[in-house]
């Protein structure tokens, strides 16, 4: 659902994130973080009926619920690489675990995290982590503007390729399928997402 952002600091936060995408030094990491919550392990009670000429795939509407999982995910903007882990919970502890994983995956150089305003992203534990890891800095998107976070593009792809038409007989199968997809995604010789949003108020030369 689209919501217009009424954040009083919208422009300042937006420009802060966009300057990372367009102007951050090339040797600095830009890592987008978020949680993909509510991934349902739905098992279809009957197999899909194959596509035929003039007729799309047909799917039985009945399914068995096996629970939900959450992907704690990170996306390296410049390298087009996904990393993360699947969890049954999403809270401050799991977010700090994600920060630890990002730090392990990128052991050298300065870096920037982009994330939304979920309360778990701005707790004392997170602030303590940032204080203990001064080479990393945190950048928040404006309220109701998570579309500025490039990991949402990756999450959308995961949803279409893995979840929408998937049938999972257990949480373990869903977990494994998501894990396998991250490996497949990173192995593809595709370029990073081509980010095109540029505020009209910005001089074009600033983005070249």
Q: Where in the sequence are the language-model features?
A:
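Short Lys/Arg-enriched helix C-cap and helix-to-coil transition segments
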Residues: 1-13
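RNase H-like polynucleotidyl transferase catalytic core
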Residues: 58-63, 132-150, 166-168
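Extended, low-complexity cationic-aromatic segments
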Residues: 14-96, 192, 199-207
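Active-site proximal helix-loop segment of RNase H-like, two-metal nucleases, encompassing DDE(D)
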Residues: 82, 151-173, 184
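Acidic/histidine-rich, metal-coordinating catalytic segments
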Residues: 109-121
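Short beta-strand segments
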Residues: 31-33, 112-115, 139-141, 196-197
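C-terminal domain-tail junction helix/linker
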Residues: 3-6, 173-208
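Short, basic/hydrophobic alpha-helical segments
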Residues: 93-112
